[in-house]
């Protein structure tokens, strides 16, 4: 089977990752001790994608947990699912990266990276046919951002032909933990543009907004935010974990979603999201799901898709839905909003379906969009970066770890290039002649 090795780095990555494993274990009927307690063969059919069967009916996640300080690891280990993970797969340092990207990437993280790679190698050797890696991390800190990107590039070196998917929590304008987030994020994006195949962008502000507006939570906790992230991660990976018609592995998803290799940053969304109190008053129908899924308020990254155009979209429907109805609704959305979809990629909306609904829903849909509006997010970080870098504020923390100012300048211009590329494809229209030629190219020759 096509296995995926999961890595989680830093505090954020480990907390999201732990939540992800809770949701996935629940969907596959695996108890906290790794015993299978499920009730349908569908749960086991492709379980080897994420789990290793170590004994009769005992499953262990293919997960590597990494941090530069022991704190978060201890809380994962003492949590409900702590005994699920293989004890050797906890790799941690003692010093912490102190929100310093350079520490994660060049000094502290670089010391730990070889022992992490040993564990990764071991996991990869236990796979039949490894399809790739997924990593959960944040881009604003030191370990997740600095060491996370170091790991990505090292794994890239060693497994050049395997897919690399990242679930990256992007710093948001209103919810900021540290003042150097723009530095860490820009340096990380500089790495991700080159080394990742698909990056799912999530940001705390958008998650807070969803909790306030849609779920009507007065004081959302990080637990609530992580729960949202884990629902989306579970949705994105549905097609990898369960048998389905459009049987996407990571590579097929990338082929459908990435028109140009650098533009692989996706917005994600999930529907139905309803406040707990009003759940029983709403019938969940396919049109309802489709409209909520494309709603700007539903995006888990703080960019408004109405500011750009979709290059490609993938929608994963789960549960008992009529595919005919789904196709009709998806088409009508495209026809009504045709100027929000680029016309030079025909059939740029892909729909997949999996019969198994997530817990607590009869049907649901997960949205993945490659929209040029994601440039808002990069612009915002770039502006904050420039404001500080112009004054060389806080730079000594990075140069003290052996970094060069040149690297900052490079990262800054790479990010600006990325924004410019998105803008270029947003404005690209097909000329009439081009359109005719494209149409002629597409028409199969008569035989």
Swiss-Prot record:
Keywords: Cytoplasm, Cytoskeleton, GTP-binding, Magnesium, Metal-binding, Microtubule, Nucleotide-binding. InterPro entries: Beta-tubulin_BS, Beta_tubulin, Tub_FtsZ_C, Tubulin, Tubulin/FtsZ-like_C, Tubulin/FtsZ_2-layer-sand-dom, Tubulin/FtsZ_GTPase_sf, Tubulin_C. GO terms for cellular component: cytoplasm; microtubule. It comes from the Eukaryota. Its cofactor is Mg(2+). The keyword Secreted does not apply. The keyword Metal-binding applies. CDD domains: beta_tubulin. One of its GO terms (molecular function) is structural constituent of cytoskeleton. SMART domains: Tubulin (SM00864), Tubulin_C (SM00865). It is found in: Cytoplasm, Cytoskeleton. Mg(2+) binds at residue 69. GTP binds at residues 11, 69, 138, 142-144, 204, 226. Residues 430-447 have a biased composition (Acidic residues). Residues 427-447 are annotated as: Disordered. One of its GO terms (biological process) is microtubule-based process. Tubulin is the major constituent of microtubules, a cylinder consisting of laterally associated linear protofilaments composed of alpha- and beta-tubulin heterodimers. Microtubules grow by the addition of GTP-tubulin dimers to the microtubule end, where a stabilizing cap forms. Below the cap, tubulin dimers are in GDP-bound state, owing to GTPase activity of alpha-tubulin. Belongs to the tubulin family. Dimer of alpha and beta chains. A typical microtubule is a hollow water-filled tube with an outer diameter of 25 nm and an inner diameter of 15 nM. Alpha-beta heterodimers associate head-to-tail to form protofilaments running lengthwise along the microtubule wall with the beta-tubulin subunit facing the microtubule plus end conferring a structural polarity. Microtubules usually have 13 protofilaments but different protofilament numbers can be found in some organisms and specialized cells. This is Tubulin beta chain. The lineage of its organism: Eukaryota, Fungi, Dikarya, Basidiomycota, Pucciniomycotina.
């Amino acid at each position: 089977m096509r296995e995926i090795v999961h890595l989680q780095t830093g505090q954020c990555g480990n907390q999201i990752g732990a939540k992800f494993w809770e949701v996935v274990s629940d969907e596959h009927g695996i108890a906290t001790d790794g015993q299978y307690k499920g009730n349908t063969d569908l749960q086991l059919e492709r379980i080897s994608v994420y789990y290793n069967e170590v004994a009769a009916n005992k499953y262990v996640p293919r997960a590597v947990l990494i941090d530069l300080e022991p704190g978060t690891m201890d809380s994962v280990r003492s949590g409900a699912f702590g005994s699920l993970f293989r004890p050797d797969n906890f790799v941690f340092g003692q010093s912490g990266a102190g929100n310093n990207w350079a520490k994660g990437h060049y000094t502290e993280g670089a010391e730990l990276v070889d022992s992490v790679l040993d564990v990764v190698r071991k996991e990869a050797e236990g796979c039949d046919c490894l399809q790739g890696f997924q990593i959960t991390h944040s881009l604003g800190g030191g370990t997740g951002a600095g060491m996370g990107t170091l790991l990505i590039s090292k794994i890239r070196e060693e497994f050049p032909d395997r897919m690399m998917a990242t679930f990256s929590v992007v710093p948001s304008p209103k919810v900021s933990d540290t003042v150097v987030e723009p530095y860490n994020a820009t340096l990380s994006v500089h790495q991700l543009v080159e080394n990742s195949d698909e990056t799912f962008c999530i940001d705390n502000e958008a998650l807070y907004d969803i909790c306030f507006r849609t779920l009507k939570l007065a004081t959302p906790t990080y637990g609530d935010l992580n729960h949202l992230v884990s629902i989306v991660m579970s949705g994105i990976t549905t097609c990898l974990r369960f048998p389905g018609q459009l049987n996407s592995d990571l590579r097929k998803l990338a082929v459908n979603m990435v028109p140009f290799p650098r533009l692989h940053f996706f917005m994600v969304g999930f529907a139905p999201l309803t406040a707990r109190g009003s759940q029983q008053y709403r019938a969940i129908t396919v049109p309802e799901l489709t409209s909520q899924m494309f709603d700007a308020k539903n995006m888990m990254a703080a960019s408004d898709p109405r500011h750009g155009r979709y290059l490609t979209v993938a929608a994963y429907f789960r549960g008992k839905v009529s595919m005919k109805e789904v196709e009709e609704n998806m088409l009508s959305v495209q026809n009504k909003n045709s100027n929000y979809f680029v016309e030079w990629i025909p059939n740029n909306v892909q729909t997949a379906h999996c019969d198994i609904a997530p817990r607590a829903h009869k049907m649901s849909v997960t949205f993945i969009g490659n929209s040029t509006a994601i440039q808002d997010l990069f612009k915002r970080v770039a502006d904050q970066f420039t404001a500080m870098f112009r004054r060389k504020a806080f730079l000594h923390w990075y140069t003290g770890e052996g970094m060069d100012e040149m690297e900052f300048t490079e990262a800054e211009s790479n990010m600006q290039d990325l924004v410019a590329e998105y803008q270029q494809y947003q404005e690209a229209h097909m000329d009439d002649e081009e359109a005719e030629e494209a149409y002629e190219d597409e028409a199969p020759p008569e035989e």
